[in-house]
Amino acid sequence: VMQRISRGVESSEIDFVPSPTLLIETHAIPFARRAILYQEGIRLVTPTIPRVPPRFISPRAKTHNYLNLILGELEAQASDPEAWAVLLDENGNFTEGRGSNVFFIKDNVLSTPDGQFVLDGITRGIVLSLAANLGLSVEERNIDLFDAYTADEAFLTSTSLCICPVHSVNGTVVNDGVVPGPMTKQLMGAFSDLVGVDFVEQYLSHLSHSE
């Protein structure tokens, strides 16, 4: 379920005060199509299109203007239709994907792009809280491609994915392709315990289905 609110339709009348337009949409989660991701991991690609800099549009505001992210996604999927795009900023640091946040793990330290430069997704926040409760070391910092290519583990978070492991970044395989890695698996279990649903099993139960 998604809620969208706009400022309403503008009028030429001087004293016109627009009233908000409210839209509520529902979308079916593509369980069958995504189920394999929990066995094989996501193939993550960083397109050449950079994320719009925060000085132009703050990424912390959920404006539903996804054009920049969609263009990056289209570029990534032109070379790999199953790829998930995460855009870099103008300095070559990771930002976010369309509706997703990215995490990397190196030497038992969990890192994610600074919340000042991404939309602070609800699932992202939950994962940071879970990591703190589990006593894991967490950093919000600049993460470049070298960090990604040398990571021990990686995963994406989103409302529908929850936590999904990453198999590779631009073709560079993470953790010899073993997914999920141990810390990712620990966080996935903690997330399932928190929400009261084994979301991985929920996805995997659709493996034999088609959508």
Task: Give the residues covered by each predicted segment.
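Phosphate/pyrophosphate-binding loop motifs in nucleotide- or prenyl diphosphate-using proteins
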Residues: Q3
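Helix-start/capping segments and mature chain N-termini
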Residues: S6, S11-E211
